[in-house]
Amino acid sequence: MSITHVKAPTSRLHFGYARCDITPPVGIYHRMWGAARHDQATGVHRALQADIVIAEPLGGDASQRMVRVQLDFVLLDNDQTLRLVTPVAASANVAPDQVIVTHSHSHSAGFFPANRYTMPGGDLIAPFLAEVNAKVAAAAAEAVATLADATVTYATTQCDMAANRDYWDDEKQIYTTGFNPGQAAENTAVVGRVTADDGSLRLLLVNYACHPTTLAWDNTLLSPDFVGALREVVEHEQNAPCCFYQAPCGDLGPKDGFVGDTAVADRNGKQVGHAALSALYSMGPPQTDFAYTGPVVSGATIGTWGWSAHDQARQAETIAFAGGSTDIPLDLIEIPTIASLEQDLERFTVEQTAADAKGDAVAARDFGARAERCRRWLGRVALLPQGKTFELNFSVHQFGDAVWVTCSAEPYSWLGSELRRRFPDLILFISPISGNAQVAYLLPRDRYGQGLYQEEPSALAPGCLEALTDAISAKISATTGHQAKD
């Protein structure tokens, strides 16, 4: 049977938005890379941003209010997140569990774990984060003040800026983390256009999977990485703010990355920005679908299509509003002991000092990187619970034809592609790195035991990614009534 009606995915809801600048001070602790030889930021490439989105059912209902805070940080630990969520919840007049914090994950935004406070520039971290908490809370109040009925229209496109980064070095017989041209990558970009009821453009949303690791150990500037130029391209063309949401990217990074040149980060961002614009140009007016309007006899008999306003039944579909957050218990691996990690840290630090004294820059860099891995594990161990399981948080919210998903940690892109395979009729806006940073990556079961970097810092056992995917899938089905495809 011929298809005569193509839905333009739509959410009709009560919507608020605000943003603020959260650029750290120059001199703050910055070294995210084990191979870096600097500790402190020496300048600013582009400003860092916090975006606050508030969603309620159409017409408004504060009891169902969802507050989403998006930060241009690599991550915050659970205590830092709680210190942010508490004032934001108060400003937005919601319970803390109605506030969801996600991160763009830029590796050049500064690095703020508690065990960095005593390092060069670490003294600036606590006062800076206190300032961020106040700024974001004030922005949350601004977002509440902007709440009004709105329409979000979605479209998907593809962008090849990101690539698989699990590269097998045949000569050295090891996996490295870098561009892997032999493996196809998840390249879906989801774009949302938020319009007011008077037709004015309020906000553009971009959801795309790529580690913001264009800039690496040679970069000493504070930067949102490719996200800054992405926003600039979209905002310049559309004359409206743009909010970027990271998507599952544990195995994805820029094809052209791990450099110190900020021009490369800007070029990567422009590539994603123009892909987002291509999706925006494919959209029709708000609250319309694309419908067949019949034949017209011309030199050929033309099949004509046009944008058709939503009827009452279609409007009812687009105002669906439901969901929330939940936890899933996942198995932990055998966690390294603090004593063994401290012993390794001391040994690598001594070896780094000796290599520096000999003028062996490469060896010093390598020993410094190994010492950094120990510091990160010590930070994780301090935050992991006693016992053999970890309660990992995720959220599922249905907004009309779209489902917004968040989850903790850093899952491989398989999470996104598999959920889209199971729910082809839904728009999925999927964002990881929502707390619980201490558990690090979630790899597919068959990727463990191969020597991949992502396994080294990960606290969760094989099978956890699949368990999380099944839990999210079940929650989507329960929330929306859509059954997952086998």
Please describe what each predicted stretch is.
Residues 2-486:
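Non-catalytic substrate/cofactor recognition surfaces at enzyme active-site rims
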